[in-house]
Amino acid sequence: ILYNKDTDYYYLFLSFGGLDASGGYNIRVARSKNSDGPYEDASGNAMIDAKGEAGSFFDDEAIKDYGTKLIGNFAITNEQDIPVGGYVSPGHNSAYYDEVEDKYYIIFHARFPNKGEQNEVRVHQLFFNSDGWPVVAPLRYAGESLAALETEDIAGDYRFYKMDNAIDSEYEEELALTLTATHLVYGQGGGYWKSSELPNESSLVLNFTEYKGYFIKQWDEVNGVETTTFSGMSAEGKALFGIKKTED
């Protein structure tokens, strides 16, 4: 459980699913004004109701629609559609606030596309949007901080990933989208992007759904360069990642 003084909410971070490569491990969150609850997700579901029938055990189907999913399986592919990054079964998490840096982090272990049960610990930065929900920076932490970005930093071709509620071994769907300097979005979906309510916050509207979050300058370790990412969440609690392409 993590308290945020700015939102005045307590956040309950959870892992759903099984931790092996086929278990569909994923990280979710719920919040409450009181440390002892009751906790609800972004859809208003009470987390105390997240359970299977009496006598059941590991009933993923019964609980899959509880908890706001922050991150699950996703594969970053290259131009030949070969996975070169991303995570499989990220979970077993801890959320942490660094008072000195005034930054929030989430620490978890993860497996990787096409690498079986090999696993490592990862640290990603957390940000809170104007709806009071945390969003996870799509790439591992490398010292980045939020800052105002120029239009040319944001515009470009992206890979986007929409998190669904499934608890399975499938990857989240990858969408190829282009963000233009005139704030339009097109490709495997359409919409626009704009500034939002909080400092440095942005909204990306995709197929009539608004995702509030942040464009972030992050280190792309696969290609060894800095790139722009986006992490946002809809009012219904659907998380969206975007990673700007950097390869030639």
What are these regions (language model features)?
Residues 1-248:
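Carbohydrate-active catalytic/glycan-binding domains of CAZyme proteins
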